[in-house]
Amino acid sequence: MEESKMKKVLAILFAVSLCISSLYTVAFAEEEMSNEMIPVCVSVPEGWDAPCCWAWADDGTNAFEAWPGEQLEPLDDGWYYTYVPRFVQNIIVNASEASVQTEGIAVEAGKAVWITVADDATASVSYEAQSMAEIPEYVEKFTVHAYVP
């Protein structure tokens, strides 16, 4: 009889540990998904130097620390790109040290987006590739501050 109780206790402990580990896995997967980065590709008019992307969610959460946002990297055929967090729902494209910019552009959260900026700073949005250029894989960027005497 004692052995039977011990088996039940061990079975319950095993079941509880499985439940806890599965909760951890689900939480980790959700966190990883919320940190997923989505490509934003932009075509700007001639004369828009050093274009940048400012991005935020409807709840006011900013994707970047400060204006003018993330500088776009050259792609091909006059296109530029950057990555934004999957929660982004609004984008402003600006350039020439923020002297020119679009209005806020509503985009679908979690979808790669292609934005074409016209000469009058209006923008059109597409969720289908507008260039044959291959977007490089996301690589996290961070600032390193160093003191060198």
What are these model-derived regions, one by one?
Residues I20-S34:
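Sec-dependent signal peptide cleavage junction
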Residues M1-I12:
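Positively charged n-region of N-terminal signal peptides that target proteins for export
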Residues E97-A129:
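Structured interaction patches on ligand/partner-binding surfaces of diverse proteins
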Residues F87-I91:
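Exposed beta-strand face motif in extracellular beta-rich ectodomains
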Residues E46-P85, E97-A106, V148-P149:
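Aromatic-rich carbohydrate-binding modules that target alpha-glucans
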Residues E36-V44, F142-A146:
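A short, amphipathic beta-strand motif
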